Design a protein with these regions (language model features):
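A short glycine-centered beta->alpha linker in the GHKL/HATPase_c
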Residues: 82-87, 91
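Helical (often loop-to-helix) elements that flank the catalytic cores of nucleotide-handling enzymes
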Residues: 89, 344-357, 560-566, 570-571
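Conserved short strand/loop->alpha-helix "switch" segment adjacent to the catalytic nucleotide/phosphoryl-transfer site
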Residues: 27-46
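C-terminal interaction appendages of subunits in large macromolecular complexes
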Residues: 391-410, 425-430, 441, 445-447, ...
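Residues immediately C-terminal
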Residues: 54-55, 82-83, 516-517
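GHKL-family ATPase ATP-binding module
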Residues: 1-15, 22, 44-46, 54-56, ...
Length: 652
């Protein structure tokens, strides 16, 4: 037995299995990494880090260091076993070269080497190599240092031994190819940090770090963030609920194996009114859910309902309790490890393995039942929360039906404030949500009436983070947004999901003033969309307009500027031979300061405007951020605004 175990842990060229070649990657990169925009650019880093995480899951790696270098290259260092460098018998070349140049070649396909492995697309580091203008692989293994360099996936020379080493592990340094990633090759520190933080919680005990070598601190050191969690998902839930008021003092936590499937989960009830369940399979964020989420919901509903009925707390309740009621105000993270995951859904992020339902259901039932029996005070608070949720759900349904019934009773049912467009094809129609009646009037004059609709919003809309659902549908501004769009709540599969079949516009554009109030209104609207119309964000329908901050004029010449750098450049350009005093700078504090023609040419004309599409890069991080921004605690919100808002020190 011990000899067999020894053979299986002997990681060498024989463990590297080859499935197909690299030829198509550069031709159709989006097929392999999702897209060639900002998301795909960051996905390259995740693919390399996933290799190191696989080593950690196999028990051979404890430290992963990621760095953004000065030229936006990426370096990933781990202390794993190091990619094998010996001769691959079938390929007749070094196993390192095979791993780096052949798609779907690697130890993750050999179940004796890795029991489970991560990576959504599973294309591995060879795909990163193919899409990099330069990549260098360094392997510390067996007391030696091996190196090979590549360009666009092709080796520049055979693997060579360049010296001795008392270290072990792999270092991958790569620079994305600007020909492929022609939108941007600039990495976002916060985006990478969010994923590494997530991985630290999902893989407790592993140390990860992210260094930004593009800038320096006052003491000359590089900014660095460290990620390490000994508590795993328990700490993850505490992080997500950091600015929410918990109903129970500590998250309910389980880490075990059911039916041969490792299941880790943590859950906590809080005083909010939304359900926040985040699920993972082999470290992949399954944003569409799947069988593990179905098992969790089934186990939660079954166990809580049985306890509530046994306690007698439901005997005077005159309404039926639904599964949704048991999850209101619940934050939970579920992580399962599956040897052969089957992914379904539009984005291939929905787990389809049926055997997982029962495993998670059983795990949730056991841990929750024990908790309820051992903590009667907390159990009572949870059941009271469920009863309150059921009452509120009935009120919300009535309020929602009132909004939706308007369409039937009043013909179109469109808000009186809406200036609609003449085109009826949603694919070409745009809806501008504009801050204030004044700017709304200017936008109505400046728009293209054929395909641009304008809906002015009066002041700040309701903060949905703090409101019960029925209050949301009673709010006039939200009712106007809801009815203008033509959407309804409830689908065949989910009675709380947004039904977008009758959506009237495929571009919904938030247009607010370029000041703190404008940012606040934008955030309130985005919070509403994220919590109650997330499908619109996921479908790519939500955008933010970017009106200019400055108008720089000299005589009849003028230029608009969106940043201070652009303003200064425009001043220098217009100054020319004249005096600087002759250049006039106007700072736009509100949309109403522009006339209709200016608003059209800078912010609404598809030929000249800049729209920022709203995407969800990391659902858990978005959940945490909205909770922090819209919650009651001032300190974390102020820190976030000072770090991220361009206007943090002006126009307050």
């Amino acid at each position: 037995m011990s000899e067999e175990k020894e053979d299986r842990s002997n990681y060498s060229a024989d463990n590297i299995q080859v499935l197909e070649g690299l030829e198509a990657v550069r031709k159709r990169p989006a097929m392999y990494i999702g897209d060639i925009g900002i998301k795909g650019l960051h996905h390259l880093v995740y693919e390399v880090v996933d290799n190191s995480i696989d080593e950690a899951l196999a028990g051979h790696c404890s430290d992963i260091q990621v760095a953004i270098l000065k030229d936006n290259s990426i370096r990933v260092i781990d202390n794993g076993r190091g990619i094998p460098t010996d001769m691959h018998h079938k390929e007749k070349r070094s196993a390192l070269e095979v791993v780096m140049t052949v798609l779907h070649a690697g130890g993750k396909f050999d179940k004796d080497t890795y029991k489970v492995s991560g990576g959504l697309h599973g294309v591995g580091v060879s795909c990163v190599n193919a899409l990099s203008i330069a990549l260098k692989a360094e392997v510390h293994r067996d007391g030696k240092l091996f190196v090979q360099e590549y360009s666009q996936g092709k080796p520049l020379y055979p693997v060579k031994e360049v010296g001795t080493s008392n270290l072990r592990g792999t270092t991958i340094t790569f620079k994305p190819d600007a020909e492929i990633f022609n939108i941007s090759t600039e990495y976002k520190f916060d985006t990478l940090a969010a994923r590494l933080r997530e991985l630290a919680y999902l893989n407790k005990g592993i140390k990860l770090s992210l260094t930004d070598e593009r800038e320096t601190n006052e003491d000359g050191t590089f900014p660095v963030e460290h990620f390490h969690s000994e508590g795993g998902l328990k700490e993850f839930v505490k992080y997500l609920d950091g600015t929410r008021e918990p109903i129970i003092p500590e998250p309910i936590y389980l880490d075990g194996t059911k039916a041969g499937i490792p299941v880790e989960l943590a859950m906590q009830y809080n005083s909010t009114y939304t359900e926040n369940v985040h699920s993972y399979v082999n470290n992949i964020n399954t944003i569409e859910g799947g069988t593990h989420v179905a098992g969790f919901r089934r186990g939660l509903t079954r166990t809580l309902k049985a306890y509530a009925e046994k306690s007698g707390m439901l005997k005077n309740l005159k309404m039926e309790i639904s599964g949704d009621d048991f999850r209101e105000g619940l934050t939970a993270v579920i992580s399962v490890k599956v040897q052969e995951p089957q992914f379904e859904g539009q984005t291939k992020t929905k787990l389809g393995n049926n055997e997982v339902i029962g495993a998670v259901d059983q795990a949730v039932g056991e841990i929750l039942n024990n908790y309820l029996e051992e903590n009667p005070k907390e159990a009572r608070l949870i059941v009271q929360k469920v009863i309150l949720a059921a009452t509120a759900r009935h009120a919300a349904r009535k309020a929602r039906e009132l909004v939706q019934r308007k369409n039937v009773l009043t013909g179109t049912g469109l808000p009186g404030k809406l200036s609609d467009c003449s085109e009826s094809d949603p694919a070409v129609c745009e809806l501008y949500l504009v801050e204030g009646d004044s700017a709304g009037g200017t936008a109505k004059q400046g728009r293209n009436r054929a395909y641009q609709a304008i809906l002015p919003l009066k002041g700040k809309i309701l903060n949905v983070e703090k409101a019960m659902e029925y209050k949301i549908y009673e709010n006039d501004e939200i009712k106007n947004i809801f009815t203008a769009m033509g959407v309804s709540v409830g689908t065949v599969d989910d009675n709380k999901a947004l039904n977008v079949i009758k959506l009237r516009y495929h571009k919904i554009i938030i247009m607010t003033d370029a000041d703190i109030d404008g940012s606040h209104i934008t955030t309130l609207i985005l919070t509403f969309f994220f919590r109650y119309m997330k499908e619109l964000i996921e479908s790519g329908y939500i955008y933010i307009a970017t009106p200019p901050l400055y108008l720089v004029k000299k005589g009849k010449d003028q230029e608009y500027a969106w940043t201070e750098d652009q303003r200064d450049t425009a001043v220098q350009r217009l100054k020319g031979a004249g005096k600087e005093e002759s250049v006039n700078i106007q700072r736009y504090k509100g949309l109403g300061e522009m006339n209709a023609e200016q608003l059209w040419s800078t912010t609404m004309n598809p030929e000249t405007r800049t729209l920022r599409q709203v995407t969800i890069e990391n659902a858990a991080e978005c959940d945490h951020t909205f909770s922090m921004l819209m919650g009651d605690e001032v300190a974390p919100r102020r820190a976030f605004i000072e770090k991220n808002a361009k206007y943090a020190r002006i126009d307050v």
